[in-house]
Amino acid sequence: MTVNTIPNVISGLKLRRSELDIQLLLSSNQDLVKKLKATELDAIIVALNETTQDDDFEILPMFSDDIFLAVNKDSKYADFKDIDLSLLKEETFLTLTKGFATHNDSDIIFKKAGFSPKVALQVNDIFTLISMVSSGVGFALLPGRISAVYESSVKLIPLKQQYHMQQEIGLVFLKSKERDPNLLALIAECRMFASNFKR
């Protein structure tokens, strides 16, 4: 999201409210939700799942994103049209640490495939994970939104239908702050992004 979604939203927000001081925090869903609940953050853009289901939260869905198998460009799987994940039982995988939505989604997909992956490394940021995949250290399950930046070094292969998984990405904020003018500007910008994304 820090590659495309967030920069687009922030540039639009700065046009609306140039005086706004924006600070970004890159972290797991779990950590960001906790900080939002404690009012340490005004709003978060995250994968919408059980961590974001809270009566205190207002949610604005923005877009959906498929999960893919990410492989090095030279991988023997790089030319596959789609992949049956159960064929990769003996392969080495890399994952994000617990608390990240993509980690949780990966667990669900591996369970559907009937195996626990051999995990060589768990990292706490997606950029390190992608870098490791591009270096051939292992494979990963990653959202399609990373492809725009890493298409020269990482190939994203669709999962066969039985393993298909989508992440719903959205803006989450506290209902108690929904009248804040800065937050209203952010909501408007996220709505604009969502409507442009669907075109």
Predicted features and spans:
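N-terminal winged-helix
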Residues: 1-17, 21-25, 30-33, 178-181
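Short beta-strand-to-loop elements that line the ligand-binding cleft
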Residues: 20-27, 116-125
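Ligand-binding cleft/hinge of the Venus flytrap
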Residues: 9-18, 103-116
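Beta-alpha-beta core module
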Residues: 54-60, 65-66, 127-175
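Flexible hinge/capping segments at coil-to-helix
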Residues: 56-67, 71-93
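Short beta-strand-centered segments that line the small-molecule binding cleft or hinge
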Residues: 8-12, 30-67, 71, 134, ...
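Secondary-structure junction motif
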Residues: 77-78, 91-113, 179-187, 197
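C-terminal effector-binding regulatory domain of bacterial HTH transcription factors
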Residues: 15-17, 104, 144-151, 162-199
